[in-house]
Amino acid sequence: MRRTLLAFLLLMLIIPAGAHPWKPRHYVIIDSDGSIDDLKAICMLLASPDVRVLAITASDGYHKAPVAYEKIRTLVDGLWHQGLPVAGGEDAARLIEETLSAETTPVTFIAMGPLKTLSEAMDQSPKFNEKVKQVLWTNSGLPGKTGLNYRTAPDAAGKVLAGSVPVIVTGAGGDGFYNQNMLEEIGNIHTPYAARVKDLINSMPSHSFVYTAFDEMAPLLLHFPELFTAAETDNKGIYNSPADLNGLRQATLKILRGETVERMQVFKSMPADTSFYMPDLQPFVAQIRNRYGEDEWTSGVIGNELHRHLGVYAIIGVKMGIRAREYFCTGVDEMMVTTHAGSMPPLSCMNDGIQVSTGATPGHGLLTVSTEKPFFAAADFTYKGKTMRISLKKELADKVSSELREINFIHGLDSDIYWELVRQNSIKYWLQFDRHEIFEIAAVE
C-alpha cells in the first residue's frame, strides 16, 4: 500500500510537468536590494521558461531602494522586458497587491534582501496570505541574525518568520562558484541572460564576492531542491544548504540555457546539425540561432513549415510575436492578439508567424484578425489588461512590400522564379531583421 501511494504521488509530480509545458510551475514576485548577486539571480529567473516573473520590487538593503530600482529597471529593460512591472519605495506594496489581485495561480515571493517590504506587504495587501503560497528568502542561516539581510531589518524578519506563510531560506555556501570553467561555459551560451551574467561578473573582476553564488541559490533551490540539504529550525522555517556545488553549477547553466521545461510536443529539439536543413539555409542556421535565440529559430522553422513556403511576412510575424512575449516577459498562450494584417496574402502571412511564436491561435480563442482597413503590418498584444501595438517600421514595410510587388510584376505568382526569389528574400530578412530594431511599440488606450 505504501509503495502504491508513493508511486501515485510521484506520478502526480510528473504529470503536471509534462502535460502543460507552456504553463510554468513557478509564478513569482521578486523583492531585491539591487546587489550584484541579486541581478545575476534575476537573470536566472527571467531565463527560465518554468518561471513567470510577475513583478519586481526594490527595497533598502545593500543599496537604498531608489538606487536598487534604477539598477533593476535598467537590467530588465536591457533584457527587452520593458513591460515587466518594477516598483520601489512606497509603490512597492501597492504593486504587490495589484499583482496578487490579478493572478489566479499561487505565487512564490522571492525576497533577496531584508524583509521590510515583505513585512509591509503582509499588512497592506489583503491578498497576501490568500495568494502567496511560500516565501523564499536568501540569508546567511536561519534565523541568521548575523546575516546582512536579517540585520538590516530584524523586526521585519521576525514578523515574517512568525507569520502564517511558510518561509524557506537559502543563500550561504557558494564561495568560488564561478570558476574559470564555469565562466567559459556561460560564455558559450547564446542567450541575453547568460551574456548579462557574464557582464556582471566581468564588471568587478577584482572583487571576490562577484565569483560567489548567494542570491543565485534562490532560483537554484526553486528549480533543483534535490541539490540542497534541508533542515527544519526553531523558527518554523526550513534552511537549505547547497549539497552539490558541481551539480548546482550545471543546474545554473541549464537555467541560463532555458532548459527547464520540455518546449516541444512531438520531437525533443530542433536539430543543431545544419545538414538537416535545406542547402540554401544551411550557411545561415548558426548565425540566426545564435543572434536571435532558440525561441525565434524554432518558431521560424515551424511557422514556415505551417506556411508551406519561406515567406518574409511569416518571418516578420514570428519576430513580432517573440518581441511581444519579451516585452511583457511572458510565455505562449498568455496574450490576446488582434492583427491588422487582414486576410489577403502576402501581408496576411504575418498572422501565421504570430500564431506560432505566441500560441495565440484561433483554436485557442486568442487570435482575432481585424477587418478594419487599411491593413498594415502590426498587431495589438494584450496581457493582464495592458495592450501594446507592435508595428513594422514604415520604411521597412514599404521596402518589403515594393520588393514583393516588383518580383510579382516581373515573374508572376505562377512562376517558379517568383517563389525562389521570395525564398531568397525571406532568408535574407530572417538574418538581417533584428526584432529589437525593426518594430515600433506603443501603448493602445
Residue ranges of model-derived segments:
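A short N-terminal beta->alpha junction/helix N-cap motif
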Residues: 33, 59-63, 287, 307-312
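Surface-exposed patches in mature extracellular/periplasmic domains of secreted proteins
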Residues: 83-84, 312-314
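Non-transmembrane, aqueous-exposed alpha-helical and coiled segments at domain scale
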Residues: 260-310, 316-445
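N-terminal acidic, glycine/proline-rich low-complexity segments
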Residues: 20-276, 362, 443-444
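Short, motif-level signal for alpha-helix interfacial/capping segments enriched in acidic residues
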Residues: 13-18, 289-292
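Sec-dependent N-terminal signal peptides
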Residues: 4-14
